[in-house]
Amino acid sequence: VSQVVQAAGLAKGTFYIYFKTKEELFLELMSGALSEFFQELNQSLSQKEIDLEGYVDLFVRKFHKDHMLIKLGALMAGVLEQNTEEEAVKKFKMNLVCQLTNAAKLLHERFPVIDEKQAARMILRSYSVLLGVAQLIPSTPIQSRLLEDPALEVLALDFAEESKAILRALWASALLLSPGCG
């Protein structure tokens, strides 16, 4: 909090007028990052020529492993929602539901075999995959150096490559196994 108020040129007391805890600030940052993501996703889905490959590429590109949605998403349930007023968490979740619903509607229009409820679940599943893959990617210089050892080479993963492979399989199976696919 001290660094934030100093960078903003505010007094610490002013911060607490707007946010009761630092977690509420992080929740607000997460909300803003999600809004930005959904805006870009919805714009892309509005382009009728986007196919499954293009959708997966967009999703992974937007969630680069250093992106705020990955960093804050990993803290969501365990940290951010623990020290936050219930009303702030509810506001965040209601906003998320609204954005998910809008994106799911566009996904259903683009891929009609997936109903809107399933489309919303698939977005959440896709995000879960990216959070999981990001946890396996080295995040410190020491971890990165260790993976240069040929004996540890099998552990060296590329975020985009691994994420795309998993999401392609996930989405292809959803499209193939949807009730509308006879």
Over which residues does each language-model region extend?
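Hydrophobic alpha-helical connector segments
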Residues: 28, 42-69, 95, 122-126
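Helix-turn-helix
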Residues: 1-24, 28
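Amphipathic alpha-helical segments used for helix-helix packing
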Residues: 65-87, 138-146
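Membrane-interface starts of transmembrane alpha-helices
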Residues: 111, 115-123
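Alpha-helical structural segments
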Residues: 7, 24-44, 98, 102
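N-terminal hydrophobic signal/anchor transmembrane helix of membrane proteins
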Residues: 37, 50-71, 156-181
